[in-house]
Regions:
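C-terminal ends of transmembrane helices
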Residues: 58-72, 115-127
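Cytoplasmic-side transmembrane-helix entry/capping segments in multi-pass membrane proteins
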Residues: 71-83, 105, 130-137
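Mid-bilayer segments of alpha-helical transmembrane spans in multi-pass integral membrane proteins
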Residues: 83-94, 103-119
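Final/C-terminal transmembrane alpha-helix of multipass membrane proteins
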Residues: 136-152
Length: 153
């Protein structure tokens, strides 16, 4: 799959769940599927990085279900999703020698994932009559898309 499409997909994951995207990238780098050694993002493939991101992702999956969690569209959450999408796009871009375009694709994906994910979740909330099943569907979508993206590297 072309690197720009992969960067857009993983950016979309960052828009859905900001820590799931770098978790997938870190595991791919650690496994050797994403060759980042010797680059500025080589730390993504270090032995501890995937575990740290995994813990952060689990924390985010739990925190997302709490009623006090702020909207993903609020500036802190939105900026975090943009940073995550850009970072993950950069990782793909470094490995594919297409850094600027993949960063841009990661950013665009994060915007699409943030606003598209919010709209989809609100629609699912209306359909289910409650938020929890909608949130779980979104979790599964983020994990599934991330797995597909790294399997396509």
């Amino acid at each position: 799959m072309p690197p720009l499409v992969l960067a857009l997909l993983i950016g979309g994951v960052a828009g859905l769940r900001s820590m799931t995207a770098p978790t997938a990238i870190a595991w791919a780098a650690y496994a050797g599927w994403l060759p980042l050694g010797g680059t500025s993002l080589g730390w993504m493939g270090w032995w501890g990085t995937p575990w740290i991101f995994t813990l952060l992702a689990i924390g985010e999956l739990v925190a997302d279900k709490l009623p006090t969690t702020p909207s993903r569209k609020a500036p802190p959450g939105f900026i975090g999703r943009l940073v995550s999408g850009a970072l993950c796009g950069a990782a793909i871009g470094l490995a594919a020698s297409s850094l600027p375009l993949c960063i841009a694709a990661g950013l665009v994906g994060a915007v699409i994932g943030t606003f598209g994910g919010h709209a989809a979740r609100m629609g699912l909330c209306r359909a289910f009559g409650t938020d929890l099943p909608a949130a779980l569907v979104e979790d599964l979508a983020a994990i599934g898309i991330a797995a597909f993206a790294v399997a396509s590297l």
